[in-house]
């Protein structure tokens, strides 16, 4: 994945994780998962509800927070 993609994903997912924002995650096959983001890395997101699920990022279509969130994106120096 390009560095630019990471500069958007990481702050967004980290804000959702730190603020315990409930999210709906839609997979590319249409399945909707709900919970809170427990952790994430380059390839997976750990989603906690009654159990913790490991969701591969390549299977995720959309992440929808239950409320509006604001986050800072650091622009890398070129």
From Swiss-Prot:
Homohexamer. RNA chaperone that binds small regulatory RNA (sRNAs) and mRNAs to facilitate mRNA translational regulation in response to envelope stress, environmental stress and changes in metabolite concentrations. Also binds with high specificity to tRNAs. It holds the Pfam family Hfq. The lineage of its organism: Bacteria, Pseudomonadati, Pseudomonadota, Betaproteobacteria, Burkholderiales. This is RNA-binding protein Hfq. NCBIfam families: Hfq, PRK00395.1. Residues 10-69 form the Sm domain. GO terms for molecular function: RNA binding.
């Amino acid at each position: 994945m390009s560095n630019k993609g990471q500069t958007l994903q990481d702050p967004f997912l980290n804000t959702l994780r730190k603020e315990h924002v409930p999210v709906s995650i839609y997979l590319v096959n249409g399945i909707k998962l709900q919970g809170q983001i427990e952790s994430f890395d380059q390839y997976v997101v750990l989603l906690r509800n009654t159990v913790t699920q490991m969701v591969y990022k390549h299977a995720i279509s959309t992440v929808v927070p239950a409320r509006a969130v604001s986050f800072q994106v650091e622009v890398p120096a070129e």
